[in-house]
Amino acid sequence: MQRILLVEDHASFRQTLAYIFDGEPDFEVVAQAGSLAEARRTAVGVGADLGVIDLTLPDGEGVELIRDLREANGDFAALILTASVDKTEHARAVEAGAAGVVHKSADVDEILDATRRLAAGETLLSQQEIVELLRLAGQVREEEREAQASIGQITPREREVLQTLAEGLSNKEIAARLHMSVDTERTHMMNILNKLGVHSRLQALIFAARYGLVELK
């Protein structure tokens, strides 16, 4: 009997999965959770053999949970459930120790088959797929490092310029809001573009929003 930790933020989907797993002779759902914090609490002491874990949770990512659980128990097996087709997200899950990724649109038999294969010690990915995903994860980490280095160069005044840009203000409006000349505003913007390695105000705004430099209202 394989003991399952089921982590999924949509209660109805989670309850359906639990009903399906508990109806199988070789599975038992020993703990359920709808968030990262709840999963960390409920996972303690239940002795789960494997986890069926949502990639995106309200208060974090399934990747964080997998990493924690595998650090505590190197034999813990994890299957990621996701609605995403973004390979970079899959790559991060595999790098954290997930043995496979199944889309939420998969039918019941596919989810059960994937879980049984996982319980048998199989991985759901070929060696080539694993290598490609790990390579992609490395590229993502490098991009993150470069982004953080760029962010570190942005001055408080330049952050103010970015924030007013996020509010949809024009050059003149930004200058007026921040009590500077239009030429000074343009100089700040040029410095921002250079530091972030982008070529337009729109690209700067996208970068700033992605990495939390601005608050979008």
PLM feature spans:
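Conserved acidic carboxylate
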Residues: E8
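Acidic, metal-coordinating helix/loop segments flanking the phosphotransfer/catalytic sites
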Residues: Q32-L50
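Acidic catalytic/metal-coordinating carboxylates
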Residues: S35, E61-E64
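Active-site residues of response regulator receiver
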Residues: D54-T56, T82
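Short amphipathic alpha-helix used as the core "switch/output" element in two-component signaling
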Residues: V63-D75
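Short, conserved "switch-loop" micro-motifs in signal-transduction and mechanochemical regulators
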Residues: A83-V85, D183
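Short, flexible helix-to-coil linker/hinge segments that flank and couple to helix-turn-helix
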Residues: H90-E95, G100-G152, P156, E160, ...
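Recognition helix of helix-turn-helix DNA-binding domains
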Residues: G168-Q203
